[in-house]
C-alpha cells in the first residue's frame, strides 16, 4: 500500500515523527513504482530526515547520565556517560 510522503519543516519533527516518515520513504523507494524525478526528491528528503534523526540521537545521548553508586550500593549522584 502506497503511503503519502509528508512535506514541510523537518527540524520541527520529533525523532519518532522523522523516523516514521523515513520508513515511509524507504517503503516507497523499495517498491520501485515511483517515477525517477520523484524518487530523487524523496531520497533527498530521506537523507535530510536521517541527518535530523542522527542530530536528535546525539543530543539525547549527550543528556544521558550514569548513576554513581556509593560503596554501600546506594545512589550518590550522576556523572556524564562518557566521563570515564
UniProtKB/Swiss-Prot annotation:
GO terms for biological process: DNA catabolic process. InterPro entries: Exonuc_VII_S (IPR003761), Exonuc_VII_ssu_sf (IPR037004). One of its GO terms (molecular function) is exodeoxyribonuclease VII activity. Gene3D superfamilies: Exonuclease VII, small subunit. Its EC number is 3.1.11.6. GO terms for cellular component: cytosol; exodeoxyribonuclease VII complex. It catalyses: Exonucleolytic cleavage in either 5'- to 3'- or 3'- to 5'-direction to yield nucleoside 5'-phosphates. It is found in: Cytoplasm. Coiled coil: none annotated. Keywords: Cytoplasm, Exonuclease, Hydrolase, Nuclease. It comes from the Bacteria. Bidirectionally degrades single-stranded DNA into large acid-insoluble oligonucleotides, which are then degraded further into small acid-soluble oligonucleotides. HAMAP family: Exonuc_7_S. Belongs to the XseB family. Heterooligomer composed of large and small subunits. NCBIfam families: PRK00977.1-3 (NF002139), xseB (TIGR01280). This is Exodeoxyribonuclease 7 small subunit. The gene is xseB.
